[in-house]
C-alpha cells in the first residue's frame, strides 16, 4: 500500500514532465504555420486517433471516374502535428487521378485492388512510369507532377500516405481552368491556344 | 525546327538548375545522418521508385504468429531522403506484433484484412486502444510504445507508413530479453523477477 | 546629441525588424505542435531564462530510491521554442531510473556525483552499457530504451539535457502496469505471464 | 608576448570546437539527401561565397523571350548546406517565365527593372496575381504553380531567392510535352486533346 | 452542364483537403515558436503576398550613412510560415552596415547599385571579405558576424534575403553600447577599456 | 528450441529494418551539411557514446582566467547526427568567458560550482543578466551575444549543452582582433577608434 502511494506520487511527478506526445487539432482555432492548436490532453479519446472514412470507395460517378478521399488534419484531427496524413484513391474503369502535385509532402502509394499506371516527372524532365499490381508500392517525391490511371478493366483502389499532416493537393487542370485566371494569362504561360483554354474553362467552370 | 532548338537549349539550361528531387540510396556507401549518398540521377530507373515485397503475406509460422515486412531505405532505396517508408503487417489467428516503438517516426496504419486491436500508451501513461476493421486508419505518435493484435479468428493484415525513411523498430521483448543485457540489470530496471527474466531470455535466445 | 537622436531612430527602426529570438511560453494558452504561444517580449524578464529547481536533490524516498526533476517547457517556460530542456537525476544507494524512453529527443547525461551505470539498447538490439564517474558524459539516441542505476554505495546525481523543449518521458513499467491497459493485452504483447502482470499492476496501482 | 601566447593557445583550443559554419560543396562527390559533401575548410576562399553570374541579363533570344539564370548549389557551391539559393529572371518584351513550380522551396521575387505580372494558384484553386514595379517584392509559397510575364513594353528583370540550396524547377510545358511521356497519358491526365498534345510535343521536342 | 456539376463537386471535395499552402500572419494574435497564427484563407488577398516598401531608398541621413529596410513577417505578413524574408540596404557614400549577426538565418545579398565591400568572420576566426559590383551575389552563413560597407564614391544598394521569416538582427555596437548593460560587464567581456565603452555608450544612448 | 529458432529468425528479419538509431562520426571522411558519415554499426562500441574529457577543469592559466572544453562532434564522435553537444566552462577567480555567440544552437547552462554572472542581449537590444548559483540553469537563445563571468572569489564551473552536434563558437574579440581583418574595416564597422583596435590586435595576435 505504502509502496503504491510512493510509486503513484512518483508517477504523477514524472507525468508532469510528459506533454505533447500528440496534438489533436482544435479545428475551431486559427491555424499556425506548424498546424492547429491542440485540444487539451484530458479531452483526447482513443477514437481521436482513428479515421473511418477510408473504408468504403469514394464516389466515382464523375468526369474522371475516380475519387480522392482525404484524411488530412482537417478531416482527421488526431494527426495534427504528427507529420503524416493519408488518403484513399478509387478508380473506376477508365478512371484517372489527373496530373497533380502535393506542394508540401512526398507520397507513398500502396495498391489495394486492380491495376494502376502511375508516374511522375522530375525537375530534370525525366519520366518515371510504372504499372502496379495490388501490394506494390510506389513513392512520389515531394512537389513533382504525378498521376494515377486505372490500367485494368475493373475498379482499382489505393491508399496513399504523405509525410505532412497538410500535404496540399494542386490539380493541374483545376489550377489552370477552374478559376478566374484570365484566359490570356493561361495561354501566355502554357502555350496552349485560347480555344483549348476556353473550352476547358467551360467544362471545368472557370471564368475569365 | 529553329524553335525547337531554342527551346531545347532553354530546356537544358534550366534543367541544369534542377537537382535532387530524389536521392536513390547507394547502399554500398557509408550512411550520413541524413541518409545514404545518392546514386547518380542518370542511373535512376522508374523501378527504383517501386517496391514489390509487400504484395504477399510475410511468414507467420513463428512464435508470434505474425510478420513485419519492412520497406525502409535499406530495402527500398528509392525512398532514401524522401522522409517516408512503409511496411506490411501480417497477423495469423492469435498473431501479435508485440509491444514496440519506432524511435524516429510517427506511424499511420491502414487495415487491409481482418480485425486488429491496436493501441498505444502516452508519456502521460494514458492508454488508447481501438479495434479496427478493414479500411480504418489509426495513427501512432512518434516514439510511443504500441502494439497490434489479431482481434478476429481469421488472418489480418495492414499496411503501415512512417514519416522517416529509417523509422527504426525497437521490440520491447527483444530489447530486454534477446541480447546480452545482464539479468541483474533487466531485473533492476524493470522490476520483473529474475526467474521471469531468465525464462524469457531462454526463449528469446538472450544471454547474461 | 543630434548623433544620438539619429542613432536612436536607427536603433528603433532596426529593432522593429527583430522579433522572436525567444518565445517564453504562455502556459495558459493552448499548445501548438511547435510549442506554447509566446508571452509578449515586453513582459519577458531575465528571470524567465533561469530555472532554480535543479539545485537540490529530488526526494528519493520511494520504491526506486531515485528522483527525476524535470525542467521542460511546462516547468521552465523560458525554453519554449528553443529546442532544449533539462532535468536532474538523483539516485540514492540502490536507486534506479527504470527502463524508459524519451519519444521526442536525444539526451546527454553529465554525472555530478557518485557512480552511475547507464545503458541503452539499439533498434538492432545491441546493448551499450557503461559505468560513469563524475564529469563523464554519455549520450542516448532519440527514442531508445535506456536506464540509469546507482553503481556505488553513496548517492549519485546527474544533469541531463534534451534537444527538445518537450522530450516526453515514457517509463516502461508505468506504461505496462500503472494504467488500465487490460492484463490480457499486456500478456499478449509482452509474453509476460498473467501472474507477473497482475502482481506489478498491484504494486503500481494499475487496473484491468 | 606571454599574454599573446596564452591567448593564441586559447584561440586554437576554442577554434577546434568550431566547425561547419558552412559547407562549400565538393561537386565531384556523390550528393546526400542534405546536399553535397563539404570541401575542407582550409581550401575555402572568400570567392567561394560570391557568385558573379547574375550580373548580366540571360539570353532571351528564344521562344519564351525570357531567361532564368540559376545560382543553385550546382552553380554556386558556397551555398551548399546553407538553405538558400538565388536566380535571375530576364524578360524581353513579350517574355514569359511559363507556369512552373519549385518542388522544394518558397520563393521571394524582387523586381529589378521593368514591369512584371506575376501570380500563383493555391491548392484551394484561388488565383493571386499582381503586376509589380521595380523594388516591389512578391512571395510564392512552396510547390505551387506560378508564372512571371513581362507586363511592359521594355525589358524586365528580377532577382529571386529560394529557401533551399536545391529548390528544383519544374516547368509545366516541359514536364508535359518535352519528354517521352506518351501522348495517351498526357491526354488522359490533363484532358487536353491529342492534337494539342502532339503539336506541343512537336514544338518542344517531345516524343511518344 | 452535368459534367460541370460533377467536376465542381469533385473540385470542392478535393479542395477541402487543401489547406495551409500559406499562413498570412494575424499580427494581433500572440506569436508561436513557428510564427504568427494565420488569418483565414478567405480573407487573404493577392496584395498580401506583395510588399512595396523596398522600392525606394531608406533614409541614410544618420551616423552610419546607411539604412536597413526590413520586410520580415512583422512588416510583410504574407511570408509568415514560408521560411523566407527580405530587406533592402542603402549605403550613402561612406555608409556602413555595422558588424552584425542574424541569429536565425543565412543571408544572400544581391548588389543593386554601387560597390559594396562585404565580409564575414567564421567560427574558426577566418576572414572572408570581397568587394562586390552590381549583380554580384554573396552568401553569409547563419549567425556569423558580418558587415557591408560602401566601397565607392556614390550611393550603393542591395537586396538581401534570409531563410527565415524572422531572421533577427543583432547589431554589435547596439548590443554592447546602446542599452543598460553595465560598463563593467562590457569591459570585462570585451577587453575594451572603460573610457572607450563609456564614450560609445554616450554616443549610442546607452546607460550603466 | 524450435521456438527459439523461429524467434531468432524473426529477430533478424526485423533487425534488418532497423538502422541509424545513431551515426558515430567517421572523422576521416568529408563532412556533409548534416554531419560526418557514420562508421559501420558493427564497429560501434559502448565507449563511443561516452566522453571523459569534461571531468577535470580546463587550464585557466591564461588571459581570461577561464577555459572552455568542448565535446562537440569533432571531439565526441558518438553524438554526430544526434543534434546535441556539450562543453565544460571553468572560471578561475576573475575569470570570464568573453562575449560570444553560437551561430547554430541554443544553449542550456548548469552551474556546477561557484557563482557565475551570465547574460545575453536580444535582437531587440534588451539585456538579460543573472547571477547564478550551483544547480541553477540558464538558457541562451540561438545566435545571440552572451557571456559568463565569475561572480565569486573562488573558482566556478558549469556544464553547457547545445541543441546541435556542431554549435559553432564565435568569440567577439577573436573575430574582431585576432585575425587579418584590416584595422580600417574593424574601425569602420564597430566605431571603435584605430588605436583601440590596433592595441587589441597586438594583444590577440591579429594583423592588418
Curated annotation (Swiss-Prot), chains A, B, C, D, E, F:
Free-text function comment from the UniProt entry: May play a role in plant defense. Probably has no oxalate oxidase activity even if the active site is conserved.
Signal sequence, renumbered to the chain: 1-18
Subcellular location: Secreted, Extracellular space, Apoplast
GO cellular component, one term: apoplast
Cystine pairings recorded for this chain: 23-38
Glycosylated position list: 59
Subunit-level organization: May not form oligomer.
Organism: Arabidopsis thaliana
Residues covered by the Cupin type-1 domain: 52-198
Lineage: Eukaryota, Viridiplantae, Streptophyta, Embryophyta, Tracheophyta
Tissue localization of expression: Expressed during germination, and also in green shoots, etiolated seedlings and whole seedlings.
Similarity comment text for this entry: Belongs to the germin family.
List of residues binding Mn(2+): 100, 102, 107, 146
PANTHER family given in the database record: GERMIN-LIKE PROTEIN SUBFAMILY 3 MEMBER 3
Note: Is the most highly expressed of the GLP genes.
Keywords recorded for this protein, A-Z: Apoplast, Disulfide bond, Glycoprotein, Manganese, Metal-binding, Secreted, Signal
Originating gene: GLP1
Protein name: Germin-like protein subfamily 3 member 1
Gene Ontology molecular function, alphabetical: manganese ion binding
